[in-house]
C-alpha cells in the first residue's frame, strides 16, 4: 500500500540547450547560460560561425584566436585559474592545450558518454566543464552559470553563435493522482 500511495520515481538524464552569441572584435566577453536546474552534471559550449550559408552549414566549433576561458558558477570560478588555450590557437599549433582536453574529457565522462578520441579538438572546438565530481550534481537553482572568454589582442574574432548544452537530471514521479516532473 505504501508503494501505491507514493508512486514510482524515475531519474532521467536530459539535456537543455541555450543559445548566446559572441560579438566580433571584443576581447573579453561572457557567455550567459540561464540554466536553473537543481541537478546539473556538466556544461558544454560550442561556438559556431554566425554567418553561414544554409546549404553549407558547419556545426564544428571554431576556436579562432581564443586565449583562455573559465566557468563561473554563481560567484565561484571553476577551475581556479583560467584554462589557457593559446598554444592551440597559435599559428605553429605545436601541441594541444592539455588543461582544455582534460576539462573536456571530464565533461564527457560526467554525461556518461566517455571519450574515444579527442584528435579533432581544433576543428570541432568545445568548451566543457564537469560541474561536480564522482558522478554528483550541482544545484544551479539559485546561481547563474557563465563562461568568461578572452581572445588574444590584435587578432579579430568573428561573430559566433554559442550553443551550450547542459546535462542535468530530471526526476519523474508517477502517483495515482498524476505525474510530476522536478528539474
Protein language model regions, located:
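Flexible assembly/topogenesis modules
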Residues: 1-183
Amino acid at each position: 500500500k505504501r508503494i501505491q500511495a507514493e508512486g514510482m520515481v524515475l531519474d532521467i538524464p536530459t539535456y537543455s540547450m541555450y543559445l548566446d552569441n559572441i560579438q566580433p572584435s571584443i576581447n573579453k566577453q561572457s557567455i550567459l547560460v540561464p540554466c536553473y536546474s537543481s541537478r546539473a552534471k556538466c556544461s558544454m559550449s560550442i561556438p559556431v560561425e554566425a554567418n553561414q550559408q544554409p546549404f553549407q552549414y558547419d556545426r564544428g566549433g571554431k576556436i579562432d584566436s581564443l586565449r583562455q576561458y573559465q566557468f563561473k558558477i554563481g560567484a565561484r570560478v571553476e577551475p581556479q585559474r583560467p584554462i589557457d588555450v593559446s598554444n592551440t590557437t597559435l599559428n605553429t599549433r605545436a601541441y594541444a592545450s592539455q588543461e582544455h582536453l582534460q576539462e573536456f574529457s571530464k565533461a564527457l565522462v560526467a554525461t556518461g558518454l566517455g571519450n574515444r578520441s579527442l584528435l579533432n579538438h581544433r576543428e570541432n572546438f568545445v568548451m566543457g566543464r564537469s560541474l561536480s565530481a564522482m558522478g554528483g550534481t550541482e544545484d544551479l537553482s539559485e546561481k547563474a552559470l557563465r563562461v568568461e572568454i578572452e581572445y588574444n589582442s590584435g587578432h579579430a574574432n568573428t561573430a559566433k553563435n554559442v550553443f551550450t548544452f547542459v546535462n542535468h537530471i530530471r526526476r519523474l514521479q508517477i502517483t495515482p493522482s498524476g505525474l510530476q516532473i522536478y528539474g
